[in-house]
Amino acid sequence: HWMHAHTLQEQLLLAAPLIVADPADDANDEQEVVILLHDFSFSSPEELLAGLQSKNTGGAMPINGMDLSGDAGGAMAGMSHGGMAMDINDIEYDANLANDRSLDDPEIVPVERGGRLRVRIINGATATAFTIDFGALEGELIAVDGQPVEPVRGRRFPMTTGQRIDVRVRLPRDLSAAFPILALREGSKERTGIVLRPAGAAVARLGTAADMDAPVIDLTLEA
């Protein structure tokens, strides 16, 4: 679970994880890792809301002083002759955060080789959906929104706003490298995340942008 404001204060990162422990999990011998995702803007929530309510932006709302003027009757970015492109992200945020940090300075989580993890991920973003990417690690989705589910194995799991997932991961015993867990912003290259690091492993620098756009969230996992 997680606790958060139900007003514009939530956009100011007024939120925190709320983990309700189940005594039945005590015998699992697994390390818990919690990741709280946020979208962050230097603009105030009131400014962001006003931009969304404006009828002149036409699409995703630029911020940071970008010029909103122009010929509204002309071609818009992302529009083809066949019609308007899908409107995925309403706000262009300044950063995406995992546990209040970007990939410029990510949280490094110490882990044991061969250990088992329960990764609890909370999408606390106000207006951003993510695909969670475990990279070379395969995980097992075991709970959604705090409720157990039939386990689903995979390396990527979609998350919409406000959603929570629990993923169980077994680390290799010969683990010699650090492994990032990334949150890929829907339909774009922006990303955030944390890094799992066994003792002695080097941590490579990760950029805040991927080489290609992340997928658009759909209902494939629920099928």
Predicted regions and their residues:
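Short, charged, solvent-exposed linker or helix-capping segments at domain edges/interfaces
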Residues: 28-32, 46-49, 206-209
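Short, intrinsically disordered/low-complexity patches at protein termini
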Residues: 25-27, 59, 142
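Polar, glycine-rich mid-to-C-terminal structural blocks
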Residues: 33, 37, 41-98
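A short secondary-structure junction signal
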Residues: 15, 46-49, 131-132
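Hydrophobic or amphipathic alpha-helical targeting/insertion segments
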Residues: 1-36
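Histidine- and aromatic-rich segments of cupredoxin/plastocyanin-like copper-binding domains
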Residues: 39, 77-219
